[in-house]
Amino acid sequence: LIEKGLKKRTAKHSGWVVYGGIMFMPHDPNQNTSQIMSEEFRITSFIINQLTNTYSDVEFPTHPEFGDLRPFLWHNYDKVGPHFRYSLRYTTYIELENDLSITEEKTSTYKNLNKSRRQEIRYGKKSGICTSRSDDIDLFINIYLETFNRQKIDLTYEPDTIRQILNSLSKAGNLLMFSSSTSDGKIGSMAAFAKDSKRSYYIFGANTSIARESQTGTMVLWDGFELLRHSGIKCVDLEGVNSPKRGYFKLSFGGELKPYYIIGIDGPE
């Protein structure tokens, strides 16, 4: 959470990564389920009390693995004081095949694709689309700007901030970028993934006008999954399926739907 210098004491999520809030350390393997739930409940309740005693306004998204909202829902239960609000969001996890000897068409990941996505992949391969690793952050930013300029819509994120995020991830060794080009070498799409010890996260994507006439938008993800699989990544979080078009496209890759929540509380004026 980030403190914001507004009239009221405010702590809100930065907005630059999808998830935030409370994260738990691995539990003692000798604890049973009841003990784990009880311990997490007490920890969450303590954090809630600390936050609400310190800040007037609080807002953050939970992680999909954070499932127990009861301490938030029961805060000031049967009292007049402020109550937490929450709204439901979704992302999708794609499990990648662990057995590297299995060709991509035989993987469980491929079998979970919907019909139209399989067709796009077949067309993309037949047309000679090639996907490769890229370290060119400046090129990504240029294509990102082109994407929004072409569509005549406001930028979702400021380019300088994106560059800073990508550079920081790259220096830490936690950035994987891919570019997909047509058979004549024209780049159509680029995708940027962050990674940690648990999974990889699709954080930014960008398309040139070439993507509208080819399958590079599909292939940069599909081929990217295969390259991620061979680099040891076992799961990909496509980070958000919360609008119709974006949701359909990402879910067509056959991932598991995962809920998470935006939690907030507004104090008295």
Give a label for each model feature.
Residues 1-8, 63-213:
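A conserved beta-strand-loop-helix scaffold within acyl/acetyltransferase catalytic domains
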Residues 5-81, 199-255:
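Acyl-donor binding region in acyl/amide transferases
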Residues 7, 268-269:
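Alpha-helical membrane-targeting segments
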Residues 26, 64, 96-98, 265-268:
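Non-catalytic surface loops within mature trypsin-like serine protease
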Residues 60-61, 134, 158, 238, ...:
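Residue-level detector of family-conserved "landmark" positions at structurally sensitive sites
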Residues 86-91, 256-268:
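Conserved catalytic-core motifs of GNAT/GCN5-like acyltransferases
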Residues 152-157, 255-261:
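Short, structured secondary-structure boundary patches
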